[in-house]
Amino acid sequence: MHPLAMPAAMAAVAAHEQGKFWEYHDKLFANQPRFQPDQLLQYAREVGLDVNRFKAALDGGRGRPSINADMAETNALGVTGTPAFFINGRFLSGARPFNDFAQMINAELQRLNIPLPPAAAAQGGR
């Protein structure tokens, strides 16, 4: 796990508690390659969070139990990074071209004897 993953996840949970998860998420991802833990409060200010509530949530570790549960579940499923996808229980790891998804979905439809959509059938299941 990336060393900043837990602080970033806890900050996102703290932002969610104030109804600004997506704003905070977008700020984190816009600065992902270079952000530092001390910038988490700065980002909270920038997206309009109550910084005292935000800091209290971080200091109290309120998000940690749910984050740890999510991490345990992903580890049990064999997920080692992002992005990760499951299509009808089949694991697909990493950023993939659309065709990889289409092939897996069509293979699952065929395995379950579900007719392919007309466009997929016309392309031979691709």
Per-range role (PLM):
Residues 1-44:
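Structural microenvironment flanking redox-active thiols in thiol-disulfide oxidoreductases
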Residues 39-126:
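C-terminal cap of thioredoxin/glutaredoxin-like
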